[in-house]
Amino acid sequence: MLRSTTLQRLRPAVFRVQRWNSTTTSAPKPSTTHSDIVVVGGGPAGLTIAAALKHYPETVNKSVTLVEFGSLDNLKTWGPDMERFENRVSSLTPSSVEYLTKIGVWEHVNRDRVQAYRHMTAWDGVSGSKVQFNTTQLMGEGRDIAYMTENFNLQNGLLKQLANKPNLTILDKTKVEGVERTPESHNKPLVKLSNGSTISTDLLIGADGANSPVRTFSGIEARGWDYNTHGLVATVRLANEQQSAWQRFLPTGPIALLPLPNRFGSLVWSTTPKMAAQLKQLTPEQFVMMVNCAFNLEPTDIEYLVEHPDEIMTDAPYRLSQRSSNPDVPCPIVAVQDKSRASFPLKMKHADTYIAENVALVGDAAHTTHPLAGQGLNMGQGDAQSLAIAIRNAAGRGADIGSTLTLEPYWADQYFKNHKLLGVVDKLHKLYSTRNPLVVGLRSLGLDAVNSVKPVKDFLMSQAS
Amino acid sequence: MFRTVPKTTLLAPIQRRTLLNGNYPKAYPEHVPLTCLGRAVLAVGSGFGTFFDSRRGDLVATLGEATAQPYFIYKLREQMLKDPTGRRLLREQPRMTSKSLDLDKLRNMKVGSIGRTYVEWLDKEGVSPDTRAQVRYIDDPECAYVMQRYRESHDFYHALTGLPIIMEGELALKAFEWANTGLPMSGLGMVLTPLKFKPKQRKRYFDVYLPWALYNGFRSKPVINVYWEEVLEKDAEELRRDLGIEQPPDLRQMKKDMAKKK
Ligand SMILES: Cc1cc2nc3c(=O)[nH]c(=O)nc-3n(C[C@H](O)[C@H](O)[C@H](O)COP(=O)(O)OP(=O)(O)OC[C@H]3O[C@@H](n4cnc5c(N)ncnc54)[C@H](O)[C@@H]3O)c2cc1C
């Protein structure tokens, strides 16, 4: 029953498309152009793959069209107001920065707004066990763990690098509405845009985020689950300058504070959707107090106070005063930048494959993860690098850039690496979202062990970068 | 070299670390920092002492402290942190003494009120709020207060439930407290001490008092969150209802009835 009605509903749509195709000769002609490569999505992953393709001599002459649904005007004119920082900030690992430097992007990123950090403390909010990473001891003098960079800063740098590149078209405020393959197009993707035009292409790259339309059009499944957790982000002001990152694991999810220049900090508080909504509704003073509580008080305290917002300003200062000063806890947060609080549902999803004939997926389109390891954007950077190299190698040989044979090295390089990382992050999330005393005890032993055994720590650090 | 030690301290705090005494600083004036071994010795020693002489209040108190840490006292504090009144208690940290409670005023309160029931009970048993021992072996100052509060509230639990301080009454109350607070010491007493009962006492304890105590202890609200100083005027029956506690049958009356039957 159900199936037949869906079929009935689907069939006219198919017919309509076919009719529309067959009348293209007589009707006012919708323009169909060709682009060797079409990148859908102007996020960090999409812009990076475009910049990489325009870097290599083998691919620089390939025509590339980048289509972005949103407007890029804000990004292009985004200027350095040192009294404001964006709420979407990512920690770029040294290897991401290394590649961005190589393809000429990093020099366009505003470095006054990037904060390097060399020290990181993670601790268990239930047992207090902690692990500390210090790169000066581990990776040698002068190495950084990561670089806190606003997503806007990175995207702005990427756009600057892409400005005036040959054979590159950036279409913003344009939506990809469908993808078709017809015999006339030799089964290559025809990308239908909201401006009425169609682009035929040899390689369609989906860098179109977690709900990737390209993935859907290509019939690639993405499997995983909802964490039933929201990531609340905010830009906060700290009492003094910091060069350290902190993460405390609470039963509701981890809360992380990462340093930005000029006494700013980037907050990512993963918690229940309900609590995230409550936290967004607090007054700025209450919110600041709650963030300080979340780094210092017991989980019970935090949950009680969020449920009783009118007691935050009366009860919380007393509870905080009872805590003896703990050097591992970040310095007090003194303010929250207005309109900087936002929250995102967190999901763990992995596409069954990253490639199909004439199609490749990169970034969040291929995988999404919990932000607790700060790896989401970095994984996309790794994808872009690997895919660009695969395309370059094929172009150098004069091979078809869209064939699965060309794309396979990319999949082989990234899929299992990403899969392992997604798994580890997923297990960490599960391990730390329980209050079971036995599990708390065991995981604390684990964390203490990690903290005291140098080789284990070295291994983890080398995995993280 | 040597510090002057308050006369009341059981084990003199030594600055140097020994097998039993920890060398970490005191968290509050009466605090006696112990090592894990010290804590174990204290628990075993006071446990034996209590088993043979449960009237040694100091030993009972010590056993309670030695077994509450590190886990259970935090759980009890957590119960307080989940409740607005419990949090206020932690903030204000009121102490109960014969002065702070003004026993004469309580004697003039209306019959059946918490204050009146409490003072009548004190008078009947010949005890005073000042006989409660000071907490010294709990390391966290706030948890030490939780232990102190629990101890000082104990006499109110008697008033609330109407259980007398004879062995079975005391034990039934311990069972009630164990179910309600989760502190292991009360649980220990609840299962070990009946070994010393006469058969008739044991039967009464297991048939009537223990079931009452466990049932009511588990289902009632946490009694640690009652701000006793603020409910003195309240009717005991009403407070029992608020907390979800039934009154147990009068133990002494039952003893008399049984004696008559013989
Ligand atoms: C709370 C939170 C904190 C995070 N912290 C970190 C961190 O510290 N470190 C880190 O590495 N990562 C972090 N991440 C992850 C990181 O933000 C993402 O992985 C990254 O933004 C993904 O980039 P992307 O380019 O793949 O996708 P997106 O940034 O989602 O870009 C996709 C783009 O495609 C466009 N698009 C979609 N559909 C269409 C269509 N039909 N037509 C045209 N355009 C379309 C969208 O408009 C969008 O601009 C965090 C994520 C969250 C939620």
UniProtKB/Swiss-Prot annotation, chain B:
Places the protein is found: Mitochondrion inner membrane
Source species, domain of life: Eukaryota
Membrane topology of the entry: Peripheral membrane protein
Membrane spanning residue stretches: none
GO process annotations (BP): ubiquinone biosynthetic process
Residues bound to Zn(2+): H154, D155, H158, E170
Additional facts recorded: This protein may be expected to contain an N-terminal transit peptide but none has been predicted.
PANTHER family (alphabetical): UBIQUINONE BIOSYNTHESIS PROTEIN, UBIQUINONE BIOSYNTHESIS PROTEIN COQ4 HOMOLOG, MITOCHONDRIAL
Name listed for the protein in its UniProt record: Ubiquinone biosynthesis protein COQ4, mitochondrial
UniProt source species: Yarrowia lipolytica (strain CLIB 122 / E 150) (Yeast)
Lineage of source species: Eukaryota, Fungi, Dikarya, Ascomycota, Saccharomycotina
